[in-house]
Amino acid sequence: MDHLPIFCQLRDRDCLIVGGGDVAERKARLLLDAGARLTVNALAFIPQFTAWADAGMLTLVEGPFDESLLDTCWLAIAATDDDTLNQRVSEAAEARRIFCNVVDAPKAASFIMPSIIDRSPLMVAVSSGGTSPVLARLLREKLESLLPLHLGQVAKYAGQLRGRVKQQFTTMSERRRFWEKLFVNDRLAQSLANNDQKAITETTEQLINEPLDHRGEVVLVGAGPGDAGLLTLKGLQQIQQADVVVYDRLVSDDIMNLVRRDADRVFVGKRAGYHCVPQEEINQILLREAQKGKRVVRLKGGDPFIFGRGGEELETLCNAGIPFSVVPGITAASGCSAYSGIPLTHRDYAQSVRLITGHLKTGGELDWENLAAEKQTLVFYMGLNQAATIQQKLIEHGMPGEMPVAIVENGTAVTQRVIDGTLTQLGELAQQMNSPSLIIIGRVVGLRDKLNWFSNH
C-alpha cells in the first residue's frame, strides 16, 4: 500500500493554496466545503477567488510565493502551471512537516487528492495512487450510481436514533436487523429529503415498533424500454437491494445482470394474447413473498403505470396492507421514438400525443373520430396484431391514407428494427415485424430520415 487513506479534520484550520487559476479554484472548493480557514497566494486570480474573498470566505495574498505563508498551515496545495514553483512549495512544506499536494505531480507530493463521493456524513474516497486518475473517476461514477442521493441524511438521522435503538433492541442481532431495515427504507429517505417531520416521525415509529420479521414490502420498478443505460439510478439501487425480483419478458438480460446476485428471480413473462403466468397469480406471488418479510421488486418493462398493469398489482397489495412504492421508468413511446429519430411533438406537426393500447378488453372500442384528427401523434402499444384494424378504422374516420407511420421492434436495444411507410400500408408492414413492437402514426414520422441517429451507430 503506497498511500494510507485518511480523513482530515480541517474545520477552522489554516490551509494554503498556491495558484489562482481554474485548477486552484477546484481545490479551493473542496477545502472550503471542509470548513478550512483558507489562504490563496498567486500573482493573479480568476474572478471566483475575488468573489469568495469579498464574501469573507478566504484570504487572498497577491504576489510571489513567500515560504512564511506556510508557518501556521496544517496542509498546502501547489496548483500553479509552473513546475519549478510547485516543487519549491512542496519542499518548503516538507521542511515544516506539512502535508502538500502537487497537482498532476504525485511523486512530488506528500499526499494525493482522491475522487470523492460526498454523502455527508458518509464519505467515500477513490484513488489510483496518481497512476490512473481517469480510472478512479470512472469508478467513482459507478459508485455514485449505487449510493442513494439522500443516504447521508439517513446516516445523520441514524446517529440521532442510536440511543433509542439501543434501549428498544437488547441484542446486537436485533439492532443489526433494525439498521438494515432502516437504511433501505425509501420512504424514510424521501421524508428526510423533504424535511417532512410528520412523515419522518410516523415512518420511524413504524420501523421501531413493528416486528423485525414484518411482512416486507414491494417496490414497483420501471426498467425502461430495453437499453440498460436507460434504467434510472433509483431503479438500479432498488434492484440491488431486493431479496426477490419478479420480472417479465420485456426486461432485458443486460438489466437482469444488474440484479443482486443472491436475489431470487421469478419470471412471469407475458405477451398480448398469451400469459405465461396469469395476472392474478402474479398479484399473489408479490403478496406471498412480501408476507414472508422479503423486499420484493416487481420489475416491469417501460413504465409500470403506462399499460403495465402496475395499478392492478398495487391494489392487491394495498388491500392486504402491504407497504409499496413506485419507481417510474422511461416508457416505450419515449424511448422508441427517440431511438428512431421521431420526435413525438413538433411545433409544425403535432401539438399532442396519444398513448393507446392496441390490446383492448373484449367489447372495448376506441374513439376513432378523435384519433383521426390532425396535429397529433398516435402511439399504439401492443398493436401489432391489430394493425390492419387500426389502419381501417383511422381511414374510415377521415385520416389521410398517406399519413406517415412507423413500427419499432425491440426499441432502444441493439437489435432495434424500424420500418416506415404510410397508413394504407400499416397492416402489410405489421406482418413483417415481431413483438415487442410499437406503432407510431403522425406527420412527425416524416422527420425520421433527417433525425435518425441510432441506426447510424
UniProtKB/Swiss-Prot annotation:
Residues 1-204 are annotated as: Precorrin-2 dehydrogenase /sirohydrochlorin ferrochelatase. Gene3D superfamilies: Cobalt-precorrin-4 Transmethylase, Domain 1 (3.40.1010.10), Methyltransferase, Cobalt-precorrin-4 Transmethylase, Domain 2 (3.30.950.10), NAD(P)-binding Rossmann-like Domain (3.40.50.720), Sirohaem synthase, dimerisation domain (1.10.8.210), Siroheme synthase, domain 2 (3.30.160.110). One of its GO terms (biological process) is methylation. Pfam families: CysG_dimeriser (PF10414), NAD_binding_7 (PF13241), Sirohm_synth_M (PF14824), TP_methylase (PF00590). Residues 216-457 are annotated as: Uroporphyrinogen-III C-methyltransferase. It catalyses: uroporphyrinogen III + 2 S-adenosyl-L-methionine = precorrin-2 + 2 S-adenosyl-L-homocysteine + H(+); precorrin-2 + NAD(+) = sirohydrochlorin + NADH + 2 H(+); siroheme + 2 H(+) = sirohydrochlorin + Fe(2+). The active site is at D248, K270. The keyword Lyase applies. NAD(+) binds at D22, V23, L43, A44. Coiled coil: none annotated. Keywords: Cobalamin biosynthesis, Lyase, Methyltransferase, Multifunctional enzyme, NAD, Oxidoreductase, Phosphoprotein, Porphyrin biosynthesis, S-adenosyl-L-methionine, Transferase. SUPFAM superfamilies: NAD(P)-binding Rossmann-fold domains, Siroheme synthase middle domains-like, Tetrapyrrole methylase. S-adenosyl-L-methionine binds at P225, G301, G302, D303, I306, T331, A332, M382, G411. The modification Phosphoserine is found at S128. CDD domains: SUMT. Its EC number is 2.1.1.107, 1.3.1.76, 4.99.1.4. GO terms for molecular function: NAD binding; precorrin-2 dehydrogenase activity; sirohydrochlorin ferrochelatase activity; uroporphyrin-III C-methyltransferase activity. Pathway: Cofactor biosynthesis; adenosylcobalamin biosynthesis; precorrin-2 from uroporphyrinogen III: step 1/1; Cofactor biosynthesis; adenosylcobalamin biosynthesis; sirohydrochlorin from precorrin-2: step 1/1; Porphyrin-containing compound metabolism; siroheme biosynthesis; precorrin-2 from uroporphyrinogen III: step 1/1; Porphyrin-containing compound metabolism; siroheme biosynthesis; siroheme from sirohydrochlorin: step 1/1. Then it catalyzes the NAD-dependent ring dehydrogenation of precorrin-2 to yield sirohydrochlorin. Finally, it catalyzes the ferrochelation of sirohydrochlorin to yield siroheme. HAMAP family: Siroheme_synth. In the N-terminal section; belongs to the precorrin-2 dehydrogenase / sirohydrochlorin ferrochelatase family. In the C-terminal section; belongs to the precorrin methyltransferase family. This is Siroheme synthase.
